[in-house]
């Protein structure tokens, strides 16, 4: 039971947020109880003003106002109007898909590469719609305004990432179809941007609305809902609870829902067969023990497989390997991953993942993660170009090793790598190495890549050639690329300039790159590039990119029994 002071604070919080929502429709008149033509006029006037208010922060105001008014809103409540925005965006994507299925598909079918790009694009647009549906279905509560807004921003950022990836898939082929696709999906992409702008507007007012006590209260509330005193979720069964607790300290005897073993000592010989045993509509951890061995298979944890956990016998004992690539095999980058994770609430511990295509294979992903609330602990992820594709949503990596050459940690997730070893490998002759290539394409996306307490070093085979094949902390894949490196040891494998342009002056003014409290010979910033987008963080700024603030990690990471540092 809270004190009177707590009740007063909660009242202030609710009043602050409610006040903001009222301000958005400040011109709305009181509705009369009797229906008349005048009532209709008043309703239209009120609704128009409310729509103009919620559309005010958007970049495409005409598109926003026309789409909402065209949907004949029956409410002037701003939350209802924002959710109506999600609905019209879904409708627009579906209509654009239908149009593309006629206009573009006929052209794409004549070219195998274009056909593959279109088929991938169809899937990605459906994924984009799914994220928008999550937003529509999310219950709103003033008492949980921060959680509400955070979830919406993550899912809207995910929807935008899926749509951008669709366009990128056409960029990998020699064709003018990308321009055709951009034209067809222009309105739906504008609507997606507008939805994010409306939601972000709420979030920008939260810190100024006397909500300082809310974050802690919400974290405490979420923990109460999800977990017992031992920080394991209440919905975890007793056997799964014992297993998760046991695995927190490393590999050991495992009793799981499914066991994979190549020698026949488990129920399954392949990981894919074990995944097929995940119950439909699964809502509790389904733990798959993958015994020691080399598994040559392409593994996909689909969106219909939430709450899956992989536990191996060690990153050097349980190895999942593949070699799909774009450079030689002409497989779309998005589809080259040895392991693909799309099911939410995924956890992996003590496994190795690799793509063996080599530097000549070009883009060759070892691990691609598009799931929300994904956690990897004590895993080794090896490749060359595009090793780790942190595609979208919330992701956390702890005590992992990631190796590669070009853009080998890339994507548009809201992601932290903590206490990880980042290894630059020997590239092809003439190649330059970039550790990161973050892909935020909209300035309001909540996404970004944080390396916290990591160690950036070089493979022994790379060290002799570091002065010729230089390595950099990263480059901006998209216009609003955001990467923060803090409390990380940086060896002298990184060039003193630190960062590399993508092409010309692209994104140099709009990116957000920061280094904070790093150590090691490669951390000296005296000769760093002086781009407008390079930031110097204050200690207060750095708090925004910690586990508890950037990922709201206190509410979900401890439940996985993975080590986790919440603060700087």
UniProtKB/Swiss-Prot annotation:
Pathway: Glycan metabolism; pectin degradation; 2-dehydro-3-deoxy-D-gluconate from pectin: step 1/5
Other facts noted in the record for this chain: The PMEI region may act as an autoinhibitory domain and prevent untimely PME activity during transport.
Organism name: Arabidopsis thaliana
InterPro entries in UniProt: Invertase/methylesterase_inhib (IPR035513), Pectin_lyas_fold (IPR012334), Pectin_lyase_fold/virulence (IPR011050), Pectinesterase_Asp_AS (IPR033131), Pectinesterase_cat (IPR000070), Pectinesterase_inhib_dom (IPR006501), Pectinesterase_Tyr_AS (IPR018040)
Positions of the catalytic residues: 386, 407
Residues annotated as glycosylated: 94, 210, 316
Name assigned to this protein: Probable pectinesterase/pectinesterase inhibitor 23
CDD domains per record: PMEI-like_3
Similarity comment text for this entry: In the N-terminal section; belongs to the PMEI family. In the C-terminal section; belongs to the pectinesterase family.
EC number per UniProt: 3.1.1.11
GO molecular function, one term: pectinesterase activity
């Amino acid at each position: 039971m809270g004190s009177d002071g707590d009740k007063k604070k909660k009242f202030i919080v609710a009043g602050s947020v409610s006040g903001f929502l009222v301000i958005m429709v400040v011109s709305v008149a009181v509705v009369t109880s009797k229906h008349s033509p005048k009532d209709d006029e008043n309703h239209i006037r009120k609704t128009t003003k409310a729509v103009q208010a919620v559309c005010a922060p958007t970049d495409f105001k005409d598109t926003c106002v026309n789409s909402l008014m065209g949907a004949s809103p029956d409410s002037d409540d701003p939350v209802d109007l924002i959710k109506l925005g999600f609905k019209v965006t879904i409708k627009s994507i579906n209509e654009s898909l239908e149009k593309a299925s006629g206009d573009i598909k006929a052209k794409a079918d004549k070219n195998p590469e274009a056909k593959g790009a279109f088929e991938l694009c169809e899937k990605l647009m459906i994924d984009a719609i799914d994220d928008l549906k999550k937003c529509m279905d999310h219950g709103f509560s003033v008492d949980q305004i921060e959680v509400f807004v955070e979830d919406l921003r993550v899912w809207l950022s995910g929807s935008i990432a899926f749509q951008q990836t669709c366009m990128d898939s056409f960029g990998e082929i020699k064709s003018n179809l990308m321009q055709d696709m951009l034209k067809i999906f222009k309105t739906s992409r504008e609507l997606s941007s507008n939805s994010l702008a409306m939601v972000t507007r709420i979030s920008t007012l939260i810190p100024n609305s006397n909500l300082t006590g809310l974050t802690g209260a919400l974290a405490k509330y979420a923990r109460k809902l999800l977990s017992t005193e031992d920080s394991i979720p209440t919905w975890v069964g007793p056997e799964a609870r014992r297993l998760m607790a046991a695995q927190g300290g490393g590999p050991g005897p495992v009793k799981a829902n499914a066991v994979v073993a190549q020698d026949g000592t488990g129920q399954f010989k392949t990981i894919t067969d074990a995944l097929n045993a995940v119950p439909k509509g699964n809502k509790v951890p389904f733990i798959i023990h993958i015994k020691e061995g080399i598994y040559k298979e392409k593994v996909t944890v689909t969106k219909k497989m939430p709450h899956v956990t992989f536990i191996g016998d060690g990153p050097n004992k349980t190895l999942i390997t593949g070699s799909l690539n774009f450079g030689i095999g002409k497989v779309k980058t998005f589809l080259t991953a040895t392991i693909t994770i799309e099911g939410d609430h995924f956890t992996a511990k003590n496994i190795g993942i690799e793509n063996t295509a080599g530097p000549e294979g070009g883009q060759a992903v070892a691990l691609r993660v598009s799931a929300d609330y994904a956690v990897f602990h004590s895993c080794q992820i090896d490749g060359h170009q595009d090793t780790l594709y942190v595609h979208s949503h919330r992701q956390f990596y702890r005590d992992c090793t990631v190796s590669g050459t070009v853009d080998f940690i890339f994507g548009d997730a809201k992601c932290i790598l903590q206490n990880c070893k980042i290894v630059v490998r020997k590239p092809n002759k003439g190649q330059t190495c970039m550790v990161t290539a973050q892909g935020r394409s909209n300035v309001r996306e909540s996404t970004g890549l944080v390396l916290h307490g990591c160690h950036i070093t070089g493979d022994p085979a790379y060290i002799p050639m570091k002065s010729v094949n230089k390595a950099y902390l990263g480059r901006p894949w998209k216009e609003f690329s955001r990467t923060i490196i803090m409390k990380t040891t940086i060896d002298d494998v990184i060039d003193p300039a630190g960062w590399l342009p993508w092409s010309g002056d692209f994104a140099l003014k709009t990116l957000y790159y920061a280094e904070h409290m790093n150590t090691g010979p490669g951390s000296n910033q005296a000769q760093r590039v002086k781009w407008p987008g390079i930031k110097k963080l204050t200690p207060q700024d750095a708090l925004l990119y910690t586990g508890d603030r950037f990922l709201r990690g206190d509410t979900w990471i401890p439940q996985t029994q993975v080590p986790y540092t919440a603060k700087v």
